Amino acid sequence: MAETGEEETASAEASGFSDLSDSELVEFLDLEEAKESAVSLSKPGPSAELPGKDDKPVSLQNWKGGLDVLSPMERFHLKYLYVTDLCTQNWCELQMVYGKELPGSLTPEKAAVLDTGASIHLAKELELHDLVTVPIATKEDAWAVKFLNILAMIPALQSEGRVREFPVFGEVEGIFLVGVIDELHYTSKGELELAELKTRRRPVLPLPAQKKKDYFQVSLYKYIFDAMVQGKVTPASLIHHTKLCLDKPLGPSVLRHARQGGVSVKSLGDLMELVFLSLTLSDLPAIDTLKLEYIHQETATILGTEIVAFEEKEVKSKVQHYVAYWMGHRDPQGVDVEEAWKCRTCDYVDICEWRRGSGVLSSSWEPKAKKFK
């Protein structure tokens, strides 16, 4: 049975969207851009019935059945995932799946959260440095900007400075993950601390279920960052998963931005080699402390701060479970009965197969026989 406090606040919190960090905002905007540019497989609208042959409606069940031959990574044309993809699975995996299969417009409430998050994000950035807009034309340009940001931040971290929006990437349990760390700085004890700022619409701390998602997020950031500075992330893995063309010339805006930063390169391959060499020789430490800070959006009042204990085995176990879905090794799962309060404000509550089956997926989601290499 769900706790009374959770039920009372479900209307405001059950979407899992009531708080947003700068890093999540950046990843969310990247995801929205990817959705707009990606080629879809007859992507359906927000209704439970889809146009079929002769414009006759096809049920969501039959539409899904036709896609089961593909893994979710193949079905959604994904080369890699964002950390926030796995964090959304931590809240409700089925909600995440419906969000990708039945994309729709943001509700006014969620749009307002994004607008506020964008404003706070901008203010935090301007505290450290001026913002520079670099026009990009290709995915190679986009990755080049990530690499240039890393090259600019490494010296700051070496001198025990503070940086924001540190890009992280690496292969975890067979899936390539990309993310953005909100902030890295050193404590008075000289320890490297990851700080994740969460802005809250309401002046209350999040529910335990939301905190669990936040704990997983910062732990996963640490796991990937540590692998990067310890030389465990390789250029071969990056190229294999992202399918980047290393010999492709970078755009003039990117090259100009690189020169202004004292970096002379012509292609992404040159820049990537420089980044991996810099990470290897930087002697940056692993992250020592994980901190979550919750503040009220309207008043900027600090609601609470939490230090998160990093449990590597638990992180890897969760990632393995979530990755199994993306690889097509298992079906998506909804929430446990104890957390059914999350469904109250879910956009897909009326078509959710998990709810219809009382926690058991209907026939449209039953596992299909697949051959694994």
Swiss-Prot record:
Cofactor: Mg(2+); [4Fe-4S] cluster
Pfam families listed in its UniProt record: Exo5 (PF09810)
Record localization: Nucleus; Cytoplasm, Cytosol
Gene3D superfamilies the record matches: 3.90.320.10
Top-level taxon of origin: Eukaryota
InterPro entries (UniProt xref): EXOV, PDDEXK-like_dom_sf
Binding site for [4Fe-4S] cluster: C92, C343, C346, C352
Keywords assigned by UniProt, alphabetized: 4Fe-4S, Cytoplasm, DNA damage, DNA repair, DNA-binding, Exonuclease, Hydrolase, Iron, Iron-sulfur, Magnesium, Metal-binding, Nuclease, Nucleus
Region (Disordered): 37-56
Cofactor binding comment, as recorded: Binds 1 [4Fe-4S] cluster.
GO cellular component terms, semicolon-separated: cytosol; nucleoplasm; nucleus
The keyword Transmembrane helix is assigned to this record: no
Gene Ontology terms: biological process: interstrand cross-link repair
Assigned EC number: 3.1.-.-
Function: Single-stranded DNA (ssDNA) bidirectional exonuclease involved in DNA repair. Probably involved in DNA repair following ultraviolet (UV) irradiation and interstrand cross-links (ICLs) damage. Has both 5'-3' and 3'-5' exonuclease activities with a strong preference for 5'-ends. Acts as a sliding exonuclease that loads at ssDNA ends and then slides along the ssDNA prior to cutting; however the sliding and the 3'-5' exonuclease activities are abolished upon binding to the replication protein A (RPA) complex that enforces 5'-directionality activity.
Family of this protein: Belongs to the EXO5 family.
Protein name, as recorded: Exonuclease V
Species of the source: Mus musculus
Lineage: Eukaryota, Metazoa, Chordata, Craniata, Vertebrata
Protein's gene: Exo5
